[in-house]
Amino acid sequence: MDSLHIGSYSFSSRLILGTGKFSNSKVMLEAIRASGSQLVTVALRRFNREQAEDDLFGPLSALEAVTLMPNTSGASTAAEAIRAAHIARQLSGSPFIKVEIHPNPQHLMPDPIETFEAAKVLVNDGFLVMPYIAADPVLAKRLEEIGCASVMPLGSAIGSGQGLSTFEMLKIIIRESTIPVIVDAGLRSPSEAAHAMEMGCSAVLVNSAIAAAGNPPAMAEAFSEAVIAGRKAFQAGLMEQSGEAVATSPLTFLGA
């Protein structure tokens, strides 16, 4: 499989893992290893060296060939996200930042205005900015134009497991983008990850579907294989759909 390029970084895996929701750090690390992921996202609030049970930075730092992508989950304004991003960079040393601003805890939809404002500042501050957004083609293009390293439109609401309910808008974003498009949120099954990759997504980010599975490491491996299969299918080129049946064999008998 070809590499995923974000800024000057290259990753052989196109599966990005979230680190929330796992029952403990041991299961999380097993899932990351099983997935083969080389880019994982972690919330700033999990950089807690004073309380070991809440700290994910220590365990994640021990993983080889894994790059951290801090996120600003919990921020409800651009100012909060900008502050969180700078603290996260100081703690992790990572240039990546996933801008995640959702002021309403009920539906957790990303705020487009605050996200755009935060992204502008953070791009100028030298971050590789990866904003989490609704599947809005206009916003995605504007974020690309100001220098974001990728866009991360949602497949459906965070943690909902509703799959690719934004399918039609995702297709537009993919078609119009010249930066990586990473589907983030809502995926429930490996088949949905494969579908996203078949559409032409650059990568998928998965957390709940793996962390809440009966066997997270096994599910992580299943998602990894699905992402590879979907990418290969996209590169091979899917057949065109038809509104009618198309015969694959002659419809006349021999000698007729």
From Swiss-Prot:
Its EC number is 2.8.1.10. The active site is at 98 (schiff-base intermediate with dxp). It is found in: Cytoplasm. Pathway: Cofactor biosynthesis; thiamine diphosphate biosynthesis. CDD domains: ThiG (cd04728). It comes from the Bacteria. Pfam families: ThiG (PF05690). 1-deoxy-D-xylulose 5-phosphate binds at residues 159, 185-186, 207-208. It catalyses: [ThiS sulfur-carrier protein]-C-terminal-Gly-aminoethanethioate + 2-iminoacetate + 1-deoxy-D-xylulose 5-phosphate = [ThiS sulfur-carrier protein]-C-terminal Gly-Gly + 2-[(2R,5Z)-2-carboxy-4-methylthiazol-5(2H)-ylidene]ethyl phosphate + 2 H2O + H(+). Keywords: Cytoplasm, Schiff base, Thiamine biosynthesis, Transferase. One of its GO terms (biological process) is thiamine diphosphate biosynthetic process. One of its GO terms (cellular component) is cytoplasm. Its main location: cytoplasm. One of its GO terms (molecular function) is thiazole synthase activity. The keyword Chaperone does not apply. The keyword Transferase applies. It is an enzyme of class 2 (transferase). HAMAP family: ThiG. Homotetramer. Forms heterodimers with either ThiH or ThiS. PANTHER family: THIAZOLE SYNTHASE (PTHR34266:SF2). Belongs to the ThiG family. Catalyzes the rearrangement of 1-deoxy-D-xylulose 5-phosphate (DXP) to produce the thiazole phosphate moiety of thiamine. Sulfur is provided by the thiocarboxylate moiety of the carrier protein ThiS. In vitro, sulfur can be provided by H(2)S. This is Thiazole synthase. It comes from Chlorobium chlorochromatii (strain CaD3). The gene is thiG.
